[in-house]
């Protein structure tokens, strides 16, 4: 007799034939679209509605050999996000975009290499987490998006505060990952509408670490305007 639920789960898992497995019997683009539709439904993407973006540049300055543009954007009616663009100070034409999604930390300023709170310097230095700074060095125009529940979008100086909004989102038939995908797509709309003279989506990439890596993984499934995606972690293979 078995009294261990894990043993039972392994047996049940071995007997499952996943409905959405790829068998090679159908064209891969068709399979991808089928999976996207199913994933979108699971995440609650149908709960989102486009709104007036209320785009506003709040800062445009030059420092440390780089140009730094900050803007805010309404991605859903009643919700705004913070975005920061880093560019080389001497720019001759549009640069491919690199969207940087910071993970569980005090906020997107970590991606910019800016220490705002105690412990930030070690967070940046200890994991090479100043992604946007590195992206500029590699020839990209970097864009750091403040993810929901982090930093200026619901976090605190001690770190993320995403548990309550995440649980509430589930009660509303959606999830935080869906919200972060939606925000990223709306930010891309803003880039195309307002920054086409300095940024291009040709050759663009999306990258992230920790919670930013998880968001990047799902963005790769549903947002196809990027040429490449680099989630370093955390990625679940189910």
Predicted regions and their residues:
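N-terminal targeting or regulatory segments adjacent to alpha/beta-hydrolase or S9 domains
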Residues: 1-67, 75
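Glycine-rich, phosphate-binding/catalytic loops in enzymes
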Residues: 4-12, 115-118, 160-161, 224
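Long, structured ligand/cofactor-binding scaffold of large enzymes
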Residues: 66-70, 85-86
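Proline/glycine-enriched tight loop/beta-turn segments at coil->beta junctions
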Residues: 78-80, 88-97, 104-107
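Short amphipathic alpha-helices and their capping/turn segments at secondary-structure boundaries
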Residues: 83-90, 132-135, 218-221
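Structural recognition of the beta-strand scaffold that forms the well-ordered cores
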Residues: 97-100, 143-144, 205, 228-231
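Cap/lid segment of the alpha/beta-hydrolase catalytic domain
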Residues: 101-194
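Primarily recognizes the serine-hydrolase "nucleophile elbow" in alpha/beta-hydrolase
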Residues: 186-238
